[in-house]
């Protein structure tokens, strides 16, 4: 099997992002985005998705975290799509429910080629530390749009904002891990009755 490794560079007037993903990694992460909470969430994707992630970002943080947060999501989605290639042999679907203390979040995703986000998180506070919790949705939307995945997030329990967000990233990581895994029974075929994704 060819290595499923990809790199993406995204440079705008607002941000400069470099990212590298290895879908068959060991969970190694080096995240330096300038947004500590985002780095912490990227570490969840790496650790629980067994995806090696190297990301560095310089952004207009003197304004706020929005552009950096969104552009890291864009670059992650583009890099994921590139690493998946033609998607031959992948399982395609992934589902996981992750608890974190009182919080429980379920993620269901499909690497379908059709971008759609159904976002069901109810985060009770506007900030976790200095991180604006509205940016969680912005990150997921950017990933969805640029990887062309269908992503459903459902919160079944939770009152602590940090726990809810982190549970969502852990569930996303495990669901993504299932979806990108190679299914040996497919023998390299596309997981679609249409013959295209």
Swiss-Prot record:
GO terms for biological process: L-histidine biosynthetic process. Pfam families: IGPD. It comes from the Bacteria. It is found in: Cytoplasm. It catalyses: D-erythro-1-(imidazol-4-yl)glycerol 3-phosphate = 3-(imidazol-4-yl)-2-oxopropyl phosphate + H2O. Pathway: Amino-acid biosynthesis; L-histidine biosynthesis; L-histidine from 5-phospho-alpha-D-ribose 1-diphosphate: step 6/9. InterPro entries: IGPD_sf, ImidazoleglycerolP_deHydtase, ImidazoleglycerP_deHydtase_CS, Ribosomal_Su5_D2-typ_SF. Belongs to the imidazoleglycerol-phosphate dehydratase family. This is Imidazoleglycerol-phosphate dehydratase. It comes from Gloeobacter violaceus (strain ATCC 29082 / PCC 7421).
